[in-house]
């Protein structure tokens, strides 16, 4: 089975550890997958939309082109991401906000969240706040990701090696809650009816090892424990372990995606 050693694209409202410039340069997969999903929805131009976990704002800006007679706002917990988004897309509305703890006192036609929800610890509270921003008939569209077991094992084993373990003393790993995809339960308890739940793979081929390296370097949360120099070494060793595990230098990664569609009752 292929595993994804570089799976950490689902972010931006829970952990403020990514370098926004690096992430923006190495997040094509996230953007293209989200854009493809949006294009399938054929959103009417007069809809009001909120993008939860908007990150650098690139996909929020794309949404703004779809709702020219409506409106869109992007929210994210990471203030550096919001600062970047405001500077890069000055005609789009962005706000620093943690969906786990607060919601906007406004009702939206559509709520979207791309590659964000798995990183949220308190998913039930988040669904509750999402529901409060929806009116009867409002739609919720989510793309998320499932963490592959061998992927987790490789990273955990690397952190336990003698030359790395001192960097991770008392480290709280996000792996503990990443695979919680009980979205139907959280939605139902929040007044949102599940309309669709699908798990599927999207293959993505990186052009070379350096691209794969940069992708990991941009978004792997464990790197926040390390100096810049050590981060480069950590990723190099991680990729070496990965290629050794699969038995080849295969740059095609199968990302396992969760699609959830819900409607406010």
UniProtKB/Swiss-Prot annotation:
Annotated signal sequence range: 1-17
Any one GO BP annotation for this protein: methylation
InterPro entries linked: Methyltranfer_dom, SAM-dependent_MTases_sf
Pfam (any one): Methyltransf_31
Domain of life: Viruses
GO MF assignments: methyltransferase activity
UniProt record similarity statement: Belongs to the methyltransferase superfamily.
PANTHER family, sorted: TRANS-ACONITATE 2-METHYLTRANSFERASE, TRANS-ACONITATE 2-METHYLTRANSFERASE-RELATED
Protein name (record): Putative methyltransferase 235L
Annotated organism of origin: Invertebrate iridescent virus 6 (IIV-6)
Upper taxonomic lineage: Viruses, Varidnaviria, Bamfordvirae, Nucleocytoviricota, Megaviricetes
């Amino acid at each position: 089975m292929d595993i994804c050693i570089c799976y950490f694209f689902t972010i931006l409202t829970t952990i403020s550890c990514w370098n926004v410039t690096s992430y923006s340069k190495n997040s094509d997969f996230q953007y293209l997958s989200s854009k493809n999903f949006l294009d399938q929805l054929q959103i009417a131009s007069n809809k009001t939309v909120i993008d939860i976990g908007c990150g650098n704002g690139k996909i929020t800006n794309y949404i703004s082109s779809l709702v020219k007679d409506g409106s869109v706002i992007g929210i994210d917990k990471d203030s550096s991401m919001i600062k970047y988004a405001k500077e890069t897309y000055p005609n789009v509305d962005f706000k620093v906000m943690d969906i786990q703890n607060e919601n906007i006192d406004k009702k939206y036609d559509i709520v979207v969240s791309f590659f964000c929800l798995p990183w949220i610890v308190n998913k039930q509270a988040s669904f509750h706040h999402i529901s409060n921003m929806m009116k009867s008939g409002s739609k919720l569209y989510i793309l998320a990701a499932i963490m592959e077991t061998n992927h987790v094992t490789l990273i955990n084993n690397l952190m336990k090696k003698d030359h790395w373990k001192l960097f991770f003393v008392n480290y709280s790993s996000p792996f503990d809650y990443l695979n919680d995809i009980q979205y139907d339960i959280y939605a139902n308890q929040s007044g949102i009816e599940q309309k669709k739940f699908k798990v599927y793979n999207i293959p993505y081929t990186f052009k070379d090892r350096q691209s794969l390296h940069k992708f990991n370097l941009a978004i792997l949360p464990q790197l926040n424990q390390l100096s810049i120099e050590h981060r480069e070494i950590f990723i190099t060793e991680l990729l070496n372990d990965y290629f050794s595990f699969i038995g080849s230098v295969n740059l095609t990664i199968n990302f396992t995606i969760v699609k959830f569609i819900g409607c406010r009752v």
